[in-house]
Amino acid sequence: MEQGIGKKAQIVCITSGGKVLEMAKQHSFQFIEIPGGKPPRACLGYSFVHLVKVLGAYGLAPSSLFKELDNTIDLLYKENLNIKKLEVEVAKTLHKKIAVLYSLGTCEGVAVRIRQQINENSKMLCWHNTFPEMNHNELVGWTTKNDDLVVISLQTTFDYERTKKRYEVCKPLFEKYSHAVIDLHAKGNSKLEQFFYLINIGDWVSVILADLKGIDPVEVKIIDHLKGELAKMG
């Protein structure tokens, strides 16, 4: 924000409070205040919808995106029961295992989101990669059996056909050398619908995993400890 002020940029703030809200009021910036008291990772709906609204107001987001948002909400309501069943199945398979997330190219951002949710909410290690990138290096690592690994592919209808074929060629290798392979096929017509469909599954899987472990999905004491130690260094 300070850099934006220095460049005399037009600033709109989306914040749950704190220093950002204080500065917005101090400089008379437009701001949208969202509910506080929750970690940012739990407020994706609030932050994303308001971000789209702000971008739309400045002509930086297509009007069709608002319709896609409505369709995304409808899809998640419609698929709610099916998603709940799938979430439990995935979480039970992942319990006491390490997730290996593979995006087939289109939704790497979703893979990052799910990895981070499993890291923070489930307090578990997890890694992600993409096709075809993993074919150039990581694929060579699949040479020995590791029953601690569960491969999860994130697939959308927007993935390239050749990339899908690459995955299908590699899948038997994953099945041979891991505990299990789970293919998550996104539902919906637009990228937004399909991305949020997968995000919804990933978010809840991470919370269910925390419940299976009997831990609090919200606390991040180890990060708080790191910040405290860094603060001592000045």
Language-model features: where?
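A generic structural motif
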Residues: I14, M124-N135, A180-N189
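Glycine-rich phosphate-binding loops that contact phosphosugars or nucleotide phosphates
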Residues: M1-L81, K92, T156-E161, K165-A180
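A short acidic, often aromatic-flanked loop/helix-cap motif at beta-alpha or helix-coil junctions
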Residues: K38-A42, M134-H136, K187-E193
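Short, small/acidic-rich helices and loops at N termini and domain boundaries
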Residues: D216-G234
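Active-site phosphate/pyrophosphate-binding segments
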Residues: G56-V150, K232-G234
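Hydrophobic/aromatic beta-strand patches that form the interior of the parallel beta-sheet core
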Residues: V12-I14, Q30-I32, V100-Y102, W127, ...
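C-terminal active-site/capping subdomain that shapes the small-molecule cofactor and substrate pocket
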Residues: V140, K145-I222
